[in-house]
Amino acid sequence: MLEGVIRESITKANAKALKKDGYLIANVYGKGIENVNGAFKLNPFIKYLKEKKHLIFPVKLGDKTFEVVVQEYQKNPVTNELIHVDLLAVTKGVKSKFKVPVKHQGTPVGLKNKGILMLSKKRISVECAPEHLPDHYLVDVAPLDVNESILVRDLEKHENVKILDHDSIAVIGVIKAK
């Protein structure tokens, strides 16, 4: 479980001092809970996110424990370093909006025909309760030839999960190389 500290002061000077000490500024919020301003050690946070298996993960700030999902993050445009993260605290049975990653498997037929695989939608917007949240959408791209694509409507349907993206949006496809 990730452990962080609660920020007593939310001033700019306090945030700069925490960043200088190697902390990542975080906000935890959700339906029915009071917003919590916190900070996590940057390197352990990144390592934990890379190793986690599910979108929802536990964090501890002070004496409070939350089940959270990364809602949004900000990176420094020059150094590409993570500088801020918003964590949505989820409650069982309460519907929320999430962004679920798209993963692909297989080698498209179109690559042999001078095509290029284009992942046009990396995340799918969904609405559901946290207990029904899929960890990812897995797409088999092996049958795709040049100028073919997989649309949102072609994705696997999960029970109690409503996809918010329009049906006709391309998720992944093979385009002709120039």
UniProtKB/Swiss-Prot annotation:
One of its GO terms (biological process) is translation. Pfam families: Ribosomal_L25p, Ribosomal_TL5_C. The keyword Magnesium does not apply. It comes from the Bacteria. Keywords: Ribonucleoprotein, Ribosomal protein, RNA-binding, rRNA-binding. GO terms for cellular component: cytosolic large ribosomal subunit. SUPFAM superfamilies: Ribosomal protein L25-like. GO terms for molecular function: 5S rRNA binding; structural constituent of ribosome. InterPro entries: Rbsml_bL25/Gln-tRNA_synth_N, Ribosomal_bL25/Gln-tRNA_synth, Ribosomal_bL25_b-dom, Ribosomal_bL25_C, Ribosomal_bL25_long, Ribosomal_L25_dom, Ribosomal_uL5_bac-type. Belongs to the bacterial ribosomal protein bL25 family. CTC subfamily. HAMAP family: Ribosomal_bL25_CTC (MF_01334). Part of the 50S ribosomal subunit; part of the 5S rRNA/L5/L18/L25 subcomplex. Contacts the 5S rRNA. Binds to the 5S rRNA independently of L5 and L18. This is one of the proteins that binds to the 5S RNA in the ribosome where it forms part of the central protuberance. This is Large ribosomal subunit protein bL25. It comes from Helicobacter pylori (strain HPAG1).
